[in-house]
Amino acid sequence: LFIDPFLLFNSTDSEYQKIHHEMIDYLLFLQKQSEKHPKLPSEMRKAWYSFSEVKQTWLGFSLSGNAGRGMGSDFAVGLHAGLNSIFKDFGSQTVTKGRHMEKICLISPRVGRDKISDFTANFAKKYLLEYTQSFAKQYLSADQCQEFSVAKAYFNWNTKTWASQKYYLPSFNSDYVLLTPKAMLTRDDTF
């Protein structure tokens, strides 16, 4: 299963649409950075272009367990270069209706549904944390949950950094678990 950005874009749920808008806004932010810095500095790559797999969703491909590879430095470099070249008009193009981050599949032959799902999960993370916390408080007992400080819970636009936040979540093997609504998920390769 994968988190499908098209399902977020086409959803009637305003929260899902908000996640898609945040992804587009972030890509536009990265595009501006790529114009200012044609060569990607390593500290910028680490701070803004590196996205690990949100393993607590237990989605995607992995030989064992839930720890996939995420989106490595090849993706970061390719995205940076793409936003300053083939996607220079990202957000202002007129060929398709709306802005679609799924076009980043074109930057590398290794970017497919698993990596797009990883990217999307990073932006859906705050929603998933709040969704799971609400479920945990309502339906789970205290011995099934604990408070976790979650790194990169959301992007703080004021400081231009990924921020941590504490959440009360289900616990499994000393880590938290994230629930993902079925309406966000697909098995199909739609992007």
What do the predicted segments below correspond to?
Residues 1-191:
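Nuclease-adjacent, charged terminal/linker segments that flank catalytic cores
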